[in-house]
């Protein structure tokens, strides 16, 4: 059972860079629900997208799967025979807990959970690929190669769901949407100390792009059909079709 996120509730003399360690694993469902506006809507919609876009005898990938919320949503929405889901995360603690969650729900769809760098995964015979708040934690110079690997491994008509935190070129828009996000976190019970310390921990760890930067990179990777299908303040999700 998920615990309440109070990791940054006490003042710290030194703020280390954010990592998906055992402490975060313990509170992750609570943390992401209270930190990412619209997270549950995106997760539920991944199931709907899977129902529409998965094809028989194909692979589905959840890259940066954390505790498997998107994996479980895909599996619930999957209505095609002969498919398997491959979930990948580079945090051993996340993978171990993810496997527990996956095994707790019975399904005929096999799920393989791998502890690995998502850049090492060869995407093949894929109908659906999920990058749910994952690309932003990858160093920028690695992002295009990953998207190219995904594009090459997708079947014609296959889809990539790319959910991210965004920044905005217009300073007024950026400030307003950022402030609205902070208001959201306050409404979820986070204190000013928690908000400021968490933000400091994410500096140079989470590197966000503009929507336009995402579109440009996706086009370079080969995706010609890209659409922002969901946005809530400075968080959103793009669907790209091969």
UniProtKB/Swiss-Prot annotation:
It is an enzyme of class 2 (transferase). It catalyses: prephenate + S-adenosyl-L-methionine = carboxy-S-adenosyl-L-methionine + 3-phenylpyruvate + H2O. It comes from the Bacteria. One of its GO terms (biological process) is tRNA wobble uridine modification. Its EC number is 2.1.3.-. Belongs to the class I-like SAM-binding methyltransferase superfamily. Cx-SAM synthase family. HAMAP family: Cx_SAM_synthase. Homodimer. Catalyzes the conversion of S-adenosyl-L-methionine (SAM) to carboxy-S-adenosyl-L-methionine (Cx-SAM). This is Carboxy-S-adenosyl-L-methionine synthase. It comes from Psychromonas ingrahamii (strain DSM 17664 / CCUG 51855 / 37).
